[in-house]
């Protein structure tokens, strides 16, 4: 039996197990998946062609895909809970890594569940967020897609953040209240 775990680099950590199967008998074998403590692993999938509506100040209010907005390569998607402490804490954590995230140069798409929630967001409360952020509205169910594909148990618990790429691979997920989100994002980014 061969099992494997795909890494973000494209490499695969495989494990081969040999065993005997006897006639008329059930053979039980433990399924073992190798993991790397050093390299970023692919932990799920996400459609980079998923659509959202950028806020008007982003240049265009026409629906577009994450691929169109971010270009090829890795990107971050965050689904925000407006005026909720877990989201506020996450945004402050991200702001503390502004220089590193801007140096990385990839886009971060931060989404609100609807237009009303987007209107309640006070951007001025977070002046130090990276300039690579695109704000938008989740008009086409990105939050639900992430929750389903990543098998999140509490679909309504926000914020949700992922790092994914345009090959539809997810290498990082965070949901709800998290301490040190900015540091976790950068650790993953540096491992790519």
Task: Please state what every model-predicted region is.
Residues 5-34:
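Structured interaction patches on ligand/partner-binding surfaces of diverse proteins
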Residues 130-134, 150-162:
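Structural micro-motif
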Residues 75, 79-130, 142-146:
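Structural microenvironment flanking redox-active thiols in thiol-disulfide oxidoreductases
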Residues 13, 64, 171-172:
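Generic structural signal for well-ordered beta-strand positions
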Residues 32-45, 157-192:
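Thiol-/selenol-based redox modules, centered on thioredoxin-like
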Residues 50-75, 92-96:
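A short beta-strand-turn-helix
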Residues 2-3, 53, 160-162:
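Generic short beta-strand
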Residues 1-6, 168:
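A short tyrosine-centered beta-strand micro-motif
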